[in-house]
């Protein structure tokens, strides 16, 4: 036995702590840990793969485009407003709202500082809903109400103005 560890409480945020790599390491060495397994973690942190799985299961998703660093982008084909975000990662780090081509060109460079692969999708104004599931049990649904235009990093971690409605008021037909 390489380690004398009862269990790892995985509270790492981002990167290897969330993308399945650390979880693979734990499993390789038979180390018990909290949180999702390697595959679930990998899929949760890869927006492109997650969208493909959702779409293949009949779940509506916004159309998206994958943009890799160094790839030429045809700006005349873009329809605004757009959301630009890293394909990997979370916490809305590197999330940008572009309302025109000038903003897009500026924000795409900033987003590439966070990741070499980006997701571009049409902006959709909707409600921010979270459905927590633990061990297959659905917990009360949460509506997140940000005082900012977008539910961004600041809204999530730095603002005391973000409100959480539990349970969310959702039409029972849904």
Model-derived segments and their meaning:
Residues 1, 62, 170-174:
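Short, intrinsically disordered, charge-balanced linker/junction segments flanking boundaries
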Residues 14, 92, 147-150:
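Glycine-rich phosphate/pyrophosphate-binding beta-alpha loops
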Residues 1-34, 38-39, 43-45, 49, ...:
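ATP-binding N-terminal substructure of ATP-dependent carboxylate-amine bond-forming enzymes
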Residues 2-3, 43-127:
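Active-site nucleotide/adenylate-binding loops and adjacent lid/helix of ATP-dependent enzymes
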Residues 99-173:
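Phosphate-binding site of ATP-dependent enzymes
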Residues 19-21, 93-94, 130:
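Short glycine-/acidic-enriched loop or helix-start segments at secondary-structure transitions
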